[in-house]
Amino acid sequence: MEQAVYRPARKLCLAKHLMLATIGLASALGPAGFGMIVTASEVRAQAPLGTSYDPSALLDRARKKIGSTTRRLLKCTCLETIERSYYAPSEKVNANVMTENPTNSCDAKEFGGNGPLSLEVKDRLRLGVTVLGDKEIYSWAAASRFDSRSVFQIVSSGPIHMGSFGTYLPDIFENPGTRITFAGKKNEGSGEVFEYTFEVPAKASHYSVGTENAWRITGYHGSFQIYAATAELARLVEETEQLPPEAGMCRTRSRFDYHYMLIGDDEFLIPRESRVDTLSGTANETSSIITFSDCREYTAESSLRFEAEEPAATVKPGSQVPALLPAGLSLTLALSGSIDPATAAAGDAVSAKVSTAVRAPHSNQILVPAGAIAHGRILQMQHQYRSNRFLISIRFDTLEANGVVTPLSLQWDRELKAEKAITQVPLRSRGTEFSLPPPQTGETGGVFSLSATKAAYLPAGLKSKWITVNP
């Protein structure tokens, strides 16, 4: 039998952007075998006398199923969609005069218990996710290969969570330090479930909180439900202990509702929906709803590819398109397809057609022919509720012309205004506006801002003017 090696499971990482710190739940697959969590007698002791079921045996069956499916996640990749909501107190949370606690203190702060909240911002992300070795790896949904960077570098703002795909489960079910107690049984819509509570103390936890200079271990606790008939995990709920002040938040809590998804010829235990909430000392809260779709299984011929392996450009010998366009060229781009703020997400692919040929300065040489296609992705899809605006940040990074793909670095043309939008449904209010990119996009890219109405969208054919810059 292969020797079991227990690996660190989770990380919660600090990165101050937007309204709250970034969260990372980085998990490992853990050992190939299972160790006892609690003894059978300890679990049975919690069951009422006279019952015919065995909570310990059911738990053992469930653990084996969980371990099998988490290891098999190495063969799968899915699209992960994250919808994040940011809330702030409707009224200012003042310091406690009696205790002299500062307004950003975590003392007495509870989820939903600090007065009415106001929805400030919503955004949406779409990522590719798979498991490599003992961790989850990610890419933007539009990417042709996985990114060699961490998810915290890919998504530079807001709360982002690693582990929702399932790699965090070994830290609960394969951790010898986890204390599990049978809590009873109940009837759910899908049948009878057994409920257990668990606690992972800090001394046994692999859940760490990252600050700018160090990592801090935190304990956590929660409960889970197992279907009595099938020994399948139905739901898991957890909450961290109070986090250290340098974490930038007080606590996080998570809820995972599970189902088995048919991927290829096999079934895999994947969350139907996950919800991860954060609470800050200022009583701000965030809620992230995570779902998985378009899952597929790698075949024997498949292999993972990373961005670092991709050449910077695929330029054919003798091509008339230069390998790198000089700075200062003006391009008018027309969107190839519409972008609907109700469904679009950061990570989605976008493309636009070059409307007019671009010539070399002081020359008739055509550097970019009309009809060439600029490819890129959405970097931010945000709904700002106070201003009632949609903000859609886009960056184009490659240009395809005559079968040749070259790198492309663009920013808004600062001197020329965008041309009037071509639209079948007019944009309401102030219409479509254009601005420089947000800080996390760097110097390239731009932001479309439009009134947040039901009919609002960026239509196919929408033209905007850009200028080439040095990468």
Residue ranges of predicted features:
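N-terminal secretory signal peptides that target proteins for export/translocation
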Residues: 1-15
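Sec-dependent N-terminal signal peptides
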Residues: 12-31
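Signal peptide processing junction and immediate N-terminal pro/mature segment
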Residues: 29-46
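Structured extracytoplasmic
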Residues: 43-220, 229-234, 240-254, 259-324, ...
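Active-site and channel-lining beta-strand-loop segments
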Residues: 221-228, 359-360
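Contiguous beta-sheet cores, especially beta-hairpins with glycine/small-residue-rich turns
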Residues: 234-236, 320-471
